[in-house]
């Protein structure tokens, strides 16, 4: 996840001088490079191999508790967004939160377990996404239509250019 912040977001962060950016993500190999672009970097201890990492959510909750109303939280990927929403549960949310869905991923795959998980999480997703995110951004219209319908999202959503990774159809 630190790769996304260094490879596809560093140019944006480098060119906005009137704001300070903090990177909160699990560190892999780009921790030092993150420090070159972000004012502060925080290693979000998360087991990315788990579908639902309770300790990772608790760790994120401890990180975000110190954010204030001036802060904007921009979350990348649907999985990170859902984990953020669970971490933000029962908090008096003071921040403006944006979710960029870079793809629908495992939850919307044809995998049998994913289909069951999607049904089980449906109730929570509908409430948590609407409660936690001021707007959603997508990289394609099909994902926007699919997820907005599934989550019954009632806020604004936008299409943005892709992060530069070419996908063969």
Spans of model-derived segments:
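N-terminal strand-loop element at the rim of the active site
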Residues: 2-53, 143-146, 159
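Membrane-proximal helix-turn-helix segments that form the acceptor-binding/catalytic region
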Residues: 12-14, 61, 116-136
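Donor nucleotide-sugar binding/catalytic pocket of nucleotide-sugar-dependent glycosyltransferases
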Residues: 40, 126-169
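Glycine-rich phosphate-binding loop signature in dinucleotide/nucleotide-binding domains
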Residues: 65-71
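Active-site proximal beta-strand in glycosyltransferases
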Residues: 72, 90-108, 136-137, 155-158
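Short His-centered aromatic/hydrophobic patch
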Residues: 75-81, 101-102
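Short acidic, glycine/proline-rich loop/turn micro-motifs
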Residues: 109-113
């Amino acid at each position: 996840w630190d790769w996304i912040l260094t490879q596809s977001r560093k140019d944006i962060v480098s060119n906005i001088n009137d704001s300070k950016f903090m990177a909160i993500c699990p560190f892999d190999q780009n921790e030092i490079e993150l420090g070159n672009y972000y004012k502060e970097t925080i290693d979000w201890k998360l087991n990315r191999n788990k579908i639902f990492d309770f300790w990772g959510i608790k760790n994120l909750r401890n990180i975000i508790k110190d954010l204030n109303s001036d802060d904007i939280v921009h979350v990348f990927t649907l999985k990170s967004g859902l984990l953020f929403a669970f971490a933000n549960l029962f908090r008096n949310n003071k921040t403006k939160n944006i979710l960029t869905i870079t793809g629908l991923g495992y939850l919307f795959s044809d995998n049998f377990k994913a289909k069951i998980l999607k049904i089980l999480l449906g109730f929570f997703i509908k409430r948590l996404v609407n409660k936690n995110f001021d707007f959603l951004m997508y990289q394609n219209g099909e994902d926007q239509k699919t997820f907005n319908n599934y989550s019954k999202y009632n806020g604004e959503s936008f299409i943005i250019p892709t992060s530069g990774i070419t996908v063969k159809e």
